[in-house]
Amino acid sequence: MVAGLNAAAALLGGWRWYRCEESGAFWLLLRVGQGSVLAFALVIGSLAAAGKYSSDNLFYLYALLPLAIGFVAEQLRVGSAQTILDQRELPDAQAVGGLPEKEQRTVVAEIVRRELGVMATSALVVVFLALRAAGTAHGF
């Protein structure tokens, strides 16, 4: 479930990034995928609290690391806007408002595209980790 939802988000996000298109559906799917990661972590915690453990300790690394990946990806997403502003030598987001309308749209499109790429990549990493977790989930 975790791998499937995040794979769908990664594919849609990658496609939209490639085509330089915004996608409300991607963000919704990404958030659902992130929610599935949280739900999976809660299930793992509940099983551990109940005394049921995987015989392979790598399982816990692969199963819980997606939470950290999501956090780091969100930080990179936040930083992506500042990177674009720095590239254009703009001091802050308000300075974009002083640009001609066409340039404003270009800056916003670059920021959205970078954010989309970062988050689609993070979803792809989560897919890999979820599949590895599934492969190491022994002994429950």
Predicted regions: what they are:
Residues M1-F140:
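Polytopic transmembrane helical bundles with strong interfacial aromatic enrichment
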